[in-house]
Each structure stands twice: as C-alpha cells, then as structure tokens.
Amino acid sequence: MKERNYNSRTEKDYNFWRALYYQLFVVFVVMPVSKLMYKIKVEGRENVPTSSRVIYAGNHVSYLDPPMLAYAVHRRVAFMAKKELFESDNKLLKFLVHSLGGFAVNREKPELATFKTVKAVFNTPWSLGIFPQGKIVKEPVIENITKGFILFAKKFKADIVPVGICGFDGYAKKLFEKDMTIKIGKPISYELDEDEIVREWARQICEFTGFENRVEQAQPETVNC
C-alpha cells in the first residue's frame, strides 16, 4: 500500500464537505468540551480580519490548542503540524488533525509540497494556523522562536494574528474545573522586518499570558509550526 503523503493537499481537500465536517466538529465536540470542562473567555474577536488570508499564530501549551484557537477566532483554520506527529503511533490524533484540514511540515527543510498546500489553503475560505514554538511548552516562557512562520507570511502576503492561550494549567477532569482565556491580538503586517515580526509576536503573546519574554533578536532560520 502506498504511504500517504500528509504534507500534500489541494484546494479540493478544503471543499464543502470538509468545511461542514469541520463546523460540526467545532459545534458538537469543541464547544461542549470548552463550555463544560473549561470556563473559557474569549477576548479580542474584533481583531479577527474579515479576509481569510491570515496566519493565526498561538503559543502552544497543550493538544487542545488547535481546536480552542479555531473556536476563538470563529474561522476555519488549517493547522500546520510537525511531520513527527504523523509518524507517531497515535492514530486518533493523526486522524483528527488530518481530517480537520491539517497537514505535515518538515521543520528543518520544508518541502515544495508544503508551499503548494499553503497556497491551496489561501485559495479557499480557510486560514492557516501555526504554533511558532514548534512544540508544546509547559514552562511560562516564550523563547527559541524561529522565522519559519514568517517565510509563509511573506511568500503569500498574509498578516499574522497572535493568539494567546492563557491560564491553562492541566487537562480538566471534571465539569467547570478550569478557567481559560483566549486573547486575540492585533494583526502584524507581513511587510515588517522579520526580526520585528518575531519580537512583536512574542511581545503580544507575553502581554496576554504573563509569560517571560526571552526572545532574542538573532533567530535561527528553520521552519517551525
């Protein structure tokens, strides 16, 4: 059997049926969980652009981040995920990410297929979702942010919207156990200097979350998601 290529998607993959499935998943899974297990407050929805050619870039604290971010911005978001996730034995997580429009990226050396997939996403009413830290980070610090997400922003002329996921301190085990706030920041223009974009994203995220900002001016130029 031919191995599935998880980093290659076309405009047809973001059709009416996937959009419907995505919406039903948000309404019947994400929203009930967010309302029953967590007391979630969303701030800054007025900052969500009307255009779908946007990159939503959030801090990464748990596996709940993608659906919570999508719920907060009220948009269909195709998330870029590290290829290692699709190589793992977690079949449920792999299925959910892929079925909801997500795709893989090689963070060290992005392939042509990844750029074609991002182009396909932006040719539809979907937006792109990225976590610039590249992995779940439990410590309350923002550091080691690479410029990969800026590469896609500049290539496809897409502004970056910071999304701060605040107050997560563990997975809820009973109803209304946890308080969470999701804060949507002001869009950052793709036309800014690369270092300025990184600093502004980190500044807004740290302002939202209260995390320590350790972002340095000099950043390595590898791709993260």
Regions found by a protein language model. Give the residues of each.
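Glycine-rich, highly charged phosphate/nucleotide-binding loops
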Residues: K41, K109-T114
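Short, basic, glycine/proline-bearing loop/turn elements
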Residues: V29-V30, H98-V105, P132-I136
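Non-catalytic C-terminal accessory region of glycerolipid acyltransferases
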Residues: M1-W17, A113-C225
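Short, flexible loop segments at the rims of nucleotide/cofactor-binding pockets, characterized by
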Residues: M31-M37, Y56-A57, A104-E108, E139-P140
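A transmembrane-helix-recognition feature enriched in membrane-embedded lipid enzymes
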Residues: K2-G44, M68, R75, D89-L100
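Glycine-rich helix-loop-beta junction characteristic of Rossmann-like nucleotide cofactor-binding loops
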Residues: R45-P49
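Catalytic core of membrane glycerolipid acyltransferases/transacylases, capturing the structured
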Residues: T50-K109
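Short acidic-hydrophobic, aromatic-tinged amphipathic segments that line or gate anion-handling sites
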Residues: V42-E43, F103-N106, Y190
